[in-house]
A protein has these predicted regions:
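Short, acidic loop-to-helix structural element flanking the phosphoryl-transfer center
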Residues: 47-77, 112, 116, 122-123
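Short amphipathic alpha-helices and their capping/turn segments at secondary-structure boundaries
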Residues: 1-8, 122-125
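Conserved phosphoryl-transfer catalytic core
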Residues: 29-53
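Ser/Thr-glycine-rich phosphate-binding loops at phosphate-binding pockets of nucleotides
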Residues: 15, 79-83
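Asp-based phosphoryl-transfer active-site loop
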Residues: 4-21
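C-terminal cap/substrate-recognition subdomain and adjoining C-terminal extension
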Residues: 72, 83-208
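Short hydrophobic beta-strand that contains or immediately precedes a catalytic carboxylate
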Residues: 9-11, 78, 135
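A short acidic/small-residue loop/turn micro-motif
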Residues: 24-25
Length: 208
């Protein structure tokens, strides 16, 4: 029997955090920036293909509050188009004791399309009914296969005054948590199905 509690899938980059990779060219500029940014958390390192990368990570304002509060109402999981070793470096810091996220999905669970964009097909989720699954992401393309399950947020790029997670928390608790079917509620607010349908129809007309 499928669980009744709703599942909130959350994107990582530009939804919860922003990352700047350090290079010889931008090192001094980033050093100055991290000293003045309230969102800066830590400089992480991870290895990939025998190379070591250093990255400055910025948390979206109210990140901890958002996870603490929203986890009382939803099951949470990460669905990111990032590579596993990169994502886990940051997620292990955000959630070291696995308090918040039930599981993590990475790039290998996504469908690549053009220009480094990815679709996040929710058919990969087997333990929840589609009416109880919502994907919170800053990329509209992520919702392409199930637009009615999408919740779009603005991209985060180190803005100290960002309040998107406060707004997201209110929307999720007030509108998504009590609803019978997240798809009907999301369509009422976002109309993504109509948007994608129009885009598909236009492409067909242009190719005929």
């Amino acid at each position: 029997m499928l669980p009744k509690k709703k599942l909130l899938l959350i994107d990582l980059d530009e939804t919860l955090i922003h990352t700047e990779f350090r290079t010889k060219e931008n090192y001094k500029e980033l050093e100055h920036f991290v000293k003045t940014s309230k969102c800066y958390v830590k400089t992480f390192s991870f290895s990939d293909d025998n190379c070591i990368y250093f990255m400055d990570v910025f948390f979206r304002p109210y990140l901890k509050m958002f996870l603490q509060e929203i986890s009382k109402y939803f099951d949470l999981a990460i669905f990111t188009a990032a590579m596993k070793n990169y994502a886990d470096t940051i997620l292990d810091y955000i959630d070291p004791n696995n308090e918040y996220f039930q599981f993590r999905l990475y790039r290998d669970a996504c469908i690549p399309i053009q220009n480094k964009l990815y679709i996040k097909d929710l058919r990969i989720i087997k333990d929840y009914d589609p009416s109880n699954v919502i994907l919170m992401d800053n990329s509209l393309y992520s919702f392409m296969n199930q637009p009615s399950n999408g919740m779009l947020v603005n991209s985060f790029y180190t803005n100290n005054n960002d309040i998107q997670l406060i707004n997201a928390k209110s929307f999720l608790i007030d509108h998504i948590y009590p609803c019978e079917d997240v798809r009907k509620e999301c369509e009422k607010w976002y109309h993504f199905s109509k948007l994608f349908y129009k885009g598909t129809s236009k492409e067909k007309e242009e190719t005929n």
